[in-house]
Swiss-Prot record:
Record note on quaternary structure: Component of some SAGA transcription coactivator-HAT complexes, at least composed of Ada2b, not/nonstop, Pcaf/Gcn5, Sgf11 and Spt3. Within the SAGA complex, Sgf11, e(y)2, and not/nonstop form an additional subcomplex of SAGA called the DUB module (deubiquitination module). Interacts directly with not/nonstop. Interacts with the AMEX complex component xmas-2. Interacts with Cbp80; important for promoter recruitment of Sgf11 that is not associated with the DUB module.
Top-level taxonomy: Eukaryota, Metazoa, Ecdysozoa, Arthropoda, Hexapoda
Protein name (record): SAGA-associated factor 11 homolog
UniProt source species: Drosophila melanogaster (Fruit fly)
Keyword tags: Activator, Chromatin regulator, Cytoplasm, Metal-binding, mRNA transport, Nucleus, Phosphoprotein, Protein transport, Transcription, Transcription regulation, Translocation, Transport, Zinc, Zinc-finger
Residue positions, PTM Phosphoserine: 172
Compartment(s) where it occurs, according to its Swiss-Prot or TrEMBL record: Nucleus, Nucleoplasm; Cytoplasm
Molecular-function GO terms, alphabetical: transcription coactivator activity; zinc ion binding
Domain of life: Eukaryota
GO process annotations (BP): chromatin organization; mRNA export from nucleus; positive regulation of DNA-templated transcription; protein transport; regulation of DNA-templated transcription
UniProt-annotated stretches for the region Disordered: 1-22, 141-196
InterPro entries per record: SAGA_su_Sgf11, SGF11
Pfam families: Sgf11
Family, as annotated: Belongs to the SGF11 family.
């Protein structure tokens, strides 16, 4: 049975549109054909033909609708770009990028020298004076500068200093005492048999 021979029913709103019968109508007609054993082949063919016609008509309607609305190209999907194909050449990876090791050199922004990438960070620290050794030298320089400044302030008679600057440095006396005790022992730390 073709789509043209299928019985149709009117739409629910009475708009006059003809739609194919529902599945209940097909099943009811199939049950009538099964009642007689000699009509089993006809019933199976009817059911198969009805399902096939319904599927084909559905695909045709959907394709027609997509073509009229301009969305038929979306049904095909996105074509594969040639830029994303795998490359199978020697010394290249699958994306076509060379796998050979290149010497990576960086230009120092401070001195404009070419430096190997592995040595760039240590070079930049030394070049800009921000490395560990440079910071130690800078902190020593600041300490000596502060010491000279505070000695200069004390010698000029400036009384505007803080209480900490006016205090006596007790740590230097402790160092002297230790050195005096070591000289009493003649440089040895042994008790030499003396008891206290």
């Amino acid at each position: 049975m073709s789509a043209a021979n299928m019985p149709t029913t009117t739409g629910a709103q009475g708009s006059g549109n003809q739609v194919p019968t529902t599945s209940t109508t097909i099943v009811n007609h199939f049950r009538e054909l099964i009642k007689e054993p000699k009509n089993l082949d006809e019933a199976a063919n009817y059911l198969y033909q009805s399902l096939l016609d319904d599927a084909v008509v559905g695909i045709f309607n959907e394709t027609h609708h997509l073509r009229k609305s301009g969305n038929l190209a979306a049904l095909d999907g996105v074509p594969e770009d040639s830029t994303y194909r795998m490359c199978e050449m020697p010394n290249l990876d699958i994306f076509g990028i060379s796998t050979a090791k290149k010497p990576m050199d960086c230009t120092c922004p401070n001195c404009d020298r070419l430096v190997a990438a592995a040595r760039f960070a240590p070079h930049l620290e030394k070049c800009m004076g921000m490395g560990r050794i440079s910071s130690r030298i800078a902190s020593r320089r600041l300490a000596t500068k502060e010491g000279a400044t505070s000695a200069h302030l004390h010698s000029s008679g400036n009384t505007g200093g803080t209480d900490d600057e006016d205090d006596v440095d007790w740590s230097s006396d402790k160092r002297r005492k230790k050195s005096n005790q070591n000289s009493r022992n003649n440089g040895s730390k042994k008790n030499n048999g003396k008891t206290f």
